[in-house]
From Swiss-Prot:
Positions with biased composition (Acidic residues): 518-531
Family in the record: Belongs to the caulimoviridae viroplasmin family.
Record's compositionally biased regions (Polar residues): 91-100, 505-517
Region (Disordered), start-end ranges: 80-101, 505-531
Extra remark beyond the main annotation: The inclusion bodies are the site of viral DNA synthesis, virion assembly and accumulation in the infected cell.
Function: Enhances the translation of downstream ORFs on polycistronic mRNAs.
GO biological process, one term: regulation of translation
GO cellular component: host cell cytoplasm
Protein name as catalogued: Transactivator/viroplasmin protein
């Protein structure tokens, strides 16, 4: 009942966390909408400013260009309705030259208009005369042509239609559209921090990443300065910003071991494991398991029965020393993980980090580690001579618990130890190329898998085959320390598997006696063809 309550509390806490995340995302979305509204209002104000001057320009054009209203009334209607351009509809005041060669057409005067939108208020505008002197004349609209109806002549003058077309091709610098400049984006945290020149490069690195901090800057220099200041504030060593460019993933070849290690993602500053197995710890574990009572609440473990032997299910409330000692003794069948990882602090640091990373990968949901392990062999001084061999698989917990053990049995004999070693090898034989697993951690005595939506890859198959070498020849790994009598008994148990071929098998003249049933089973489970 207490376990169920803990599970319900965990689920409620997870729901609260999800609600908080959704609330933060909604707040960020509102801020983005507000920024977009501000930019849209700026754009609309620019359009309204242009609309204010268009009626005044059109009316002044009509006044200066029309000489005979009766003769040009039809053309003016066409101009007003937009069916005909101004330069084509109004032609009564085309430029004429006198005998002296002077142009008698008058320039369009726009005394009521400002000189330009961004100009300062002045009373006169200097105009250069033919003699090169400046003379003050009434303020003219510089953006307008001097002659509305002037056409391109042999002297190189341009018509109003040509000038209007050029204005359309070359937008005026007076009205700048928002969000039109180049931006550089700085990602201040996460492993991929740096400067990116395009939004498409940084978007995948921040989408769905909690706590990712980024900001845009108009220039590369400003982006570099911001990143350098952030690194100095965090106490980090500033990188070489001169060489900092948009990142491109480096395609480097990794060895099998490097690929397996990379999945753990452990930090170099993680403290080393200082746990040492001792007879006192072994006695403490046996005493706790023997003294367990069904009617008393226990947040550390509870015993179950597997193949006539007593195993335990570990909970996050377990003492770290008890948890790891029980694991080394081969007592652990399941490890249940909710949100706490402190009880794994005595495990190898890479093992614990792989478990935490898998927990985060599946959305921080309840996780279970199913362990198939052997019992260790101890020497006369009660030190481990052959460690427990473990095959563990991480998966999402389905909230189904094993029944309690009716009787606790911890009297382990040599036959039980060798049978448990054979059981571990049998578990590895059930993994084939169709299994949806991935190797997360591997050592001499432990291989840790995690469930995956994809079928097992070749690199993981090769890691499994390396792990199985100790069972096939018994000349590598932990089994190299087997005594002759122990090796002989284990060899007899392993002869039903096709992959087993030790020196004892080769020394027998008749060869290994492989049963028909065992041969068929090993043929189905052999994956040497994949290497």
């Amino acid at each position: 009942m207490e376990t169920a309550i803990i599970a319900m509390e965990t689920q409620l806490q997870q729901m609260l966390n999800n609600l908080q995340i959704a609330k933060n995302e909604a707040k960020e979305a509102q801020q983005k909408v507000a920024k977009l509204e501000v930019e849209i209002s700026k754009f609309q104000s620019g359009i309204e400013m242009m609309k204010q001057f268009m009626p005044a320009i059109t009316s002044e054009v009509c006044k200066q260009s029309v000489v005979d209203p009766s003769s040009n009334s039809e053309k003016m209607q066409e101009i007003a309705s937009g069916k005909k351009p101004i330069a084509e509809g109004v032609s009564a005041t085309s430029p004429e030259q006198t005998a002296t060669g002077k142009d008698i057409s008058k320039p369009l005067m726009a005394d009521a208009l400002p000189k330009s939108i961004n100009s300062t208020n002045v009373e006169t505008s200097p105009v250069q005369t033919v003699t090169g002197k400046d003379s003050s004349k009434p303020l003219m609209a510089d953006a307008l042509p001097k002659s509305i109806n002037s056409v391109k002549t042999e002297t190189g003058k341009k018509s109003w239609a040509d000038i209007a077309t050029e204005d359309e091709r070359e937008p005026s610098s007076l009205v700048q559209l928002p969000l039109s400049g180049k931006k550089f984006y700085v990602l201040f945290n996460t492993p991929r921090k740096g400067i990116f020149s395009d939004w498409s490069q940084i978007a995948p690195l921040i989408t769905g990443v909690k706590g990712a901090v980024h900001k845009s800057y108009p220039t590369m220099e400003a982006a570099k300065k911001a990143l350098k200041d952030a690194e100095q504030m965090n106490g980090l060593k500033a990188s070489s910003l001169e060489k900092l460019q948009p990142r491109v993933p480096a395609k480097k070849r990794q060895s099998i071991q490097e690929m397996v290690m990379a999945r753990g993602g452990f930090k170099q500053n993680t403290p080393q494991n200082t746990y040492v197995f001792s007879p006192e710890n072994r006695t403490m574990v046996n005493k706790k398991i023997f003294e367990w009572k069904k009617d008393e609440p226990n947040s550390e473990f509870y015993p179950i029965e597997i193949r006539g032997q007593t195993k335990i299910v570990l909970f996050p409330g377990a003492d770290p020393v008890f948890a790891y000692t029980a694991y080394l003794m081969g007592y652990v069948k399941q490890i249940i993980i909710f949100e706490e990882f402190k009880f794994l602090s005595c495990f190898p640091r890479l093992f614990a980090n792989c478990v935490e990373k898998f927990y985060n990968k599946i959305g921080r949901r309840e996780t279970v580690i199913n362990v198939r392990s052997s019992f260790p062999l101890l020497d006369e001084t009660m030190k481990i001579r052959i460690p427990a061999i473990n095959v563990a698989v991480m998966a999402m917990f389905n909230k189904q618990f094993e029944p309690f053990a009716e009787e606790i049995k911890l009297d382990i004999q040599l036959e039980d130890v060798l049978a448990s070693i054979e059981g571990v090898y049998e578990r590895t034989q059930k993994i084939d190329e169709r299994s949806k697993l991935k190797v997360w951690y591997q050592s001499d005595s432990t291989i840790l898998f995690g469930t995956s939506p994809k079928e097992i890859e070749d690199v993981d198959i090769r890691s499994l085959l390396r792990f199985e070498e100790m069972f096939k020849a018994m000349e590598t790994g932990p089994l190299v320390n087997l005594q002759d009598e122990e090796r002989k008994i284990l060899c007899q148990k392993m002869q039903k598997y096709k992959g087993h071929s030790c020196q004892l098998c080769k020394s027998e003249s008749s060869g290994p006696q492989t049963s028909e049933e065992g041969l068929q089973e090993s043929e189905d489970e052999d994956f040497s063809v994949l290497v």
